[in-house]
């Protein structure tokens, strides 16, 4: 039996089937902040699946909240057991999206948000029905400025991420929606409107 979710955007409580939304962006584009804002406003309707990674936690990151931090052996063990819906090796680090994590959220009747890299989002889009959203900084210069505020990353890591961002931005046309994060408040309203439009489409067939 399918579990439905009551739309937080509809005054008459129209219900629809929960759906998987993927949100991707170059490092520094602001995807984490935007997703946090969405969860804060609509905690009963949306839940973010927690990705697994073999990188070390950054200052302020919490295991099980921001990421499931694993050793390489632990990650490969889950991989061998076919526990990831998608995974990628990027910048010397493994990242993966848990099958169980997504399934658990959808079965609770909540929309699932997966904050994953571009390659992972496009992989999921081929495997199942998703709404793929790409967050983009207004310019490469602004992206570089935001990355330079991250004390947790070394210069080489920042350079690699900037170079990789060109590949990610080139793939933006393959996503269902592109949101330019020039102003955080405006970008959030655009993101919010995407969820409203998708819920309306799902509830009205």
Curated annotation (Swiss-Prot):
Keyword Transferase in record: yes
InterPro entries tied to this protein: GK/Ca_channel_bsu, Guanylate_kin-like_dom, Guanylate_kinase, Guanylate_kinase_CS, P-loop_NTPase
EC category: transferase
Main location: cytoplasm
CDD domains, A to Z: GMPK
Transmembrane segments: none
Keywords: ATP-binding, Cytoplasm, Kinase, Nucleotide-binding, Transferase
Ranges where the Guanylate kinase-like domain occurs: 18-196
Any single Gene Ontology cellular-component annotation: cytosol
EC number: 2.7.4.8
Binding site for ATP: 25-32
One annotated GO molecular function: guanylate kinase activity
Pfam families, alphabetized: Guanylate_kin (PF00625)
Places the protein is found: Cytoplasm
SUPFAM superfamilies the UniProt entry points to: P-loop containing nucleoside triphosphate hydrolases
Record Gene3D superfamilies: Guanylate Kinase phosphate binding domain, P-loop containing nucleotide triphosphate hydrolases
Reactions performed catalytically: GMP + ATP = GDP + ADP
Function: Essential for recycling GMP and indirectly, cGMP.
Protein family: Belongs to the guanylate kinase family.
Protein name, UniProt field: Guanylate kinase
Lineage per the UniProt record: Bacteria, Pseudomonadati, Chlamydiota, Chlamydiia, Chlamydiales
Gene label: gmk
């Amino acid at each position: 039996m399918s579990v439905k979710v009551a739309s937080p955007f509809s005054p008459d409580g129209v219900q629809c089937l929960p759906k998987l939304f993927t949100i991707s962006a170059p490092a520094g584009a602001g995807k984490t902040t935007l997703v946090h804002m969405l969860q804060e406003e609509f905690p009963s309707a949306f839940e973010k699946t927690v990705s697994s990674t073999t990188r070390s936690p950054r200052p302020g990151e919490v295991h099980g909240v921001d990421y499931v931090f694993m050793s390489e052996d632990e990650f490969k063990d889950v991989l061998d057991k076919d526990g990831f819906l998608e995974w990628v090796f990027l910048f010397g680090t493994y990242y993966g999206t848990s099958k169980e994590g997504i399934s658990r959220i959808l079965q609770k009747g909540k929309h699932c948000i997966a904050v994953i890299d571009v390659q992972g989002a496009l992989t999921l889009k081929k495997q199942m029905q998703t709404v793929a959203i790409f967050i983009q900084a207004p310019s490469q210069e602004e992206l570089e400025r935001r990355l330079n505020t991250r004390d947790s990353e070394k210069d080489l890591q920042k350079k690699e991420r900037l170079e990789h961002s060109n590949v990610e931005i080139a793939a933006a046309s393959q996503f269902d929606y592109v949101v330019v994060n020039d102003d955080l408040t405006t970008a959030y309203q655009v993101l919010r409107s995407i969820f409203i439009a998708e819920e309306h489409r799902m509830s009205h067939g």
